[in-house]
Amino acid sequence: MQKIVLFLDIDGVINVPEVYSSEFISCYQRFDLYGSPVPLARQFLQAVDRSESIKPFWMSKGWRKHAIVWNQWAQTRPWRVAYPISFVQMREVMAKYPGIFLDEVEDGKTLAAIWHSGNVDRVVWIEDGFPESAIFWAKLDNRVTLISTLHECDRTQIGINAENIDRIFAALNLKLD
């Protein structure tokens, strides 16, 4: 069975407040947390969680360690949080890839993705747009598939939706129930 690492951003991917209504997601330290999930968010998270071949990671600058509230909302197991990584880990990645110009601040997500990718068969990263470093890394490493949830012509089509769900499911070898 082919092992796939999935890096999943939240804002602009499964949470799109500019387009969808706000709803209660979970509580954290007695505070209510709200999000605006895309219509396919819960089904998608559950399908990923059921897969034995996918090792999912949250990759969110905004939610960071609180990303796991989305697992609670979707009634799935908590996933690991990939971002941020330590400066020691960042420097190890930068030493391993001297051909890629990597900045510790600007390219933090790319550094985290490289760090957590290890020796898996395939890497799928779903994000609302990618930095140049991620694009360059994907060109160097044929295991990497980058899927942007930005729609260049229609800004209301941000997030996981009918325009990109087939590509996402094909990359992950998934099917909705």
Language-model region placement:
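Short intrinsically disordered terminal tails
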Residues: 1-3, 176-177
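C-terminal cap/substrate-recognition subdomain and adjoining C-terminal extension
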Residues: 71-177
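Alpha-helical substrate-recognition element adjacent to the catalytic core
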Residues: 2-99
